[in-house]
Amino acid sequence: PARMDAIIIGDTRCGKGHVAEGLSKYYGIGEVVGAENCSFAGLVGGAQQIGNHWLISWGRIPLNDRGLVIVDEASELGSTDWTRLSRIRSEGIAEVTKIVQQVTNARTRLLFLTNPPSKAMSNYTFGVHALKDLIHAPEDIARFDYACVVSHEEVPIENINKKHKLTTFLHPQYAERELIMWTWSRSSDQIIFTEDAVNEIFKVANRLGKFYDIGIPLIQGENVRFKIAKVAIAYASRLYSAAQDGSILKVRRLHVQCAATFLRSLYRADVHGYYDHSWQQKELNPALQKENIDALIAYFNAYHSQDDAYSYLLNNTYVQSR
């Protein structure tokens, strides 16, 4: 299913909840739920007895089927809660098994907002490590289509404590909302990818899958193509890449390239550190160390003299920056 499941983790008072709630109100879509005031049954559902009968009361996620739920203060969810959300997040199905058992659709777009469990982001060498403190099971981390990390140190205080100009909107609010509704109403057979787009997805998936460390499984070579495709669909819909009088959403190669740039910009950010973490893990891998050493030896041997090789390395700004 082409629905997003994302998380934003970062320091308190960075505006995570304020921005998400503001956008939800502006577009008139979605529901914001505070995990600190909501049990798992409130999110998914539970059984209650009325007289001699047991009834299922569905929670906020299945009640917003094909919509959006923003879960604020997601750090209040326990590790078992993340595991119990697995079927909703992977299959879009909510299930309650008590005295009675029922299932229902929960094809809901999910955005989790959370602070790091017990530290400030500055206490982590790489911000992405906070995810492992929050969610212990790798398979639950892997279900996120992407993760964003924010820190109070990212924006200078001087840029915050000053007057700002009012935002000028390019399009009216109702048109923006209609575009979202149109996107969400597309069925799977109404979303098509051009051949160039499909080839680009495979190309990007291979590149990302080979580089990023699966110890933090936000990117895995086995399934990252689906995450890239979902983000590409979002770009295509935002630009209204339509065909057949608006009934078809057409994803092109450019939209896939935008999706790849988006993911790279997230994971290469200093505060996120997923790129740097993966680079470090590769440097610690003995097999890769030998491969790199062999490559360097071959590289040096290709020069006519060692002096030429040393001169090139000393004048190479990329090597100096590393």
Feature names for model-found ranges:
Residues 113, 121, 141, 147, ...:
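Basic, amphipathic alpha-helical bundle interface domains used for macromolecular binding and assembly
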